[in-house]
Structures are given as C-alpha cells and as structure tokens.
C-alpha cells in the first residue's frame, strides 16, 4: 500500500490521512482510542464508499498510527482539534461523521463546533465521557489516588498482553468535554450501533446519547451477541445498511453537494 498523505499542522505536528473523491455527502471515519485508520471498520467503509462513488476520508489522530506525537501526551482536546482540522482543511461540503468508541465522543464534539458542516452521525460503540464514566468510575479509591500521584495508571488490556496506560491529564482534560450531563444541542440524524456484549462501553451509553440529543431523528441498533469491536461480518453488514440508508436520507433532503474533492 502507498504511503498516506501528510497534512502539516506545525513544524513538529502532522496528521496522516487517506482521502478519496466522490459524491456528497462525504464520509469521515473517526477511529477508537489506541486504534488507527487501518482498522477493519475504516477499510470496510472505504471499500463501501468507493463502490458507491461516495467521498471518503480516514485519518490518524495525533499520538495514533502514522500521525505525529504520542498517545500519552495527547488528549480529548487535541483529538477534537484534529477532527476539526480534517473537516476544515481536508474536506469540503457536508459530511457524515462515523465514530467508533472514542470517535463517537469526538464526532459529538466536532458537530457542536461545526454544525454547518456535519449532516449526519453514526456511532459504533460510541463512548462519550468514557474518561469520567468508565475509567475513573471503575477505579478503587486507592487506584484513583495512585493515578493522581503518579500521573497515570496501567490497566489490563482486553486486546493485548501489555496493559493500557491512561494518563491523569486525559481524565482532567475530558472534564471539559463531557456530553452526557445535560441537553446535547445536536439536531442532526444520529444512528447508534452497539453490541449488548460490549465489555468496555455499556450499551446503555447509546440510550443516554439518544436521551441527551436534541434531535428527534435518532435510531439505535442493538446487537445482542456483539462485543465492543463490532467487526464481525454480520455487524459490518448492518453498518453498511445504516450508512446506505443515512446517505439516501440526506440526499433525499437535498442537504448535500453533488461531488466533493
């Protein structure tokens, strides 16, 4: 595979991305925490978009994949800035944001900041507020004290032998982006896919998003035997159905451009 394109932010910071031209609305994939743009869902959506002539973009947040920086030194604010950079500088016209896990949080942040550019949202095991509701809430008092005093904590990683390390500044920064504490001023079509066997992000998070969002066009798809990764063939088939339906709805509403770069 060819090297990704590089978008320079500063002398030391850059975002790696892959972009394909097509019809509007464009689709931007937002990966999960610790994941990158080469994951199965990103590649599946890219293949679908190319087959249907839809504009598509996937990228790595700073501290992830082939972008600059380290995950330990970046946070929700940084990754939200990366999504905004991609929307403002690497895409044109209306966009559908597809967010997986962490990406489901960032898509909410980005929509609040760029409501004129986002025309639809799809969350896959979306995890808004996970720093507070999942990481911090899951710690004992001793672990919380340790996290504060040492500046980080290492927890078991369900997908690898090495633990996942969460810096305390990630929790502190996350408090400025909590979205499920009141009304979420997003009046866009929202589609939420979640597995009921998700051991990382409870499926009830999807219902909380639906309850908080001001939009009445919110649909939740719960899959009883699906886990957090949501990457099995039947789960990807559902994702295909949902993205196809949302694109069709947006085109029917006239809220799109005919062709995007």
Describe the function of each predicted region:
Residues 65-90:
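Catalytic nucleophile-loop/oxyanion-hole region of alpha/beta-hydrolase
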Residues 91-101:
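Alpha/beta-hydrolase fold nucleophile elbow
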């Amino acid at each position: 595979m060819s090297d990704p394109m590089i978008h320079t932010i500063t002398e030391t910071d850059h975002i790696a991305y892959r972009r394909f031209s097509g019809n509007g609305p464009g689709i931007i994939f937002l990966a999960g925490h610790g994941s990158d743009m080469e994951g199965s869902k990103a590649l599946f959506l890219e293949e679908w978009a190319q087959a249907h002539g839809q504009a598509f973009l996937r990228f790595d947040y700073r501290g992830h994949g082939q972008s600059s920086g380290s995950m330990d030194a970046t946070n929700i604010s940084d990754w939200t800035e990366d999504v905004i950079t991609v929307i403002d500088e690497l895409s044109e016209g209306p966009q559908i944001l597809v967010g997986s896990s962490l990406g489901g949080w960032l898509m909410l942040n980005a929509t609040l900041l760029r409501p004129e550019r986002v025309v639809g949202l799809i969350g896959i095991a979306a995890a808004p507020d996970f720093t507070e509701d999942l990481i911090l809430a899951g710690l004992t008092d001793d672990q919380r004290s340790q996290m504060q005093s040492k500046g980080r904590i290492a927890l078991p990683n369900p997908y690898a032998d090495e633990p996942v390390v969460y810096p305390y500044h990630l929790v502190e920064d996350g408090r400025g982006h909590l979205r499920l504490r009141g009304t979420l001023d997003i009046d866009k079509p929202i589609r939420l896919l979640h597995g009921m066997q998700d051991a990382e992000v409870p499926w009830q998070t999807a219902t909380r998003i639906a309850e908080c969002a001001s939009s009445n066009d919110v649909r939740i798809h719960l899959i009883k035997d699906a886990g957090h990764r949501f990457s099995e063939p039947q789960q990807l088939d559902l994702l295909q159905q949902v993205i196809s339906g949302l694109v069709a709805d947006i085109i029917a509403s006239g809220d799109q451009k005919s062709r995007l770069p």
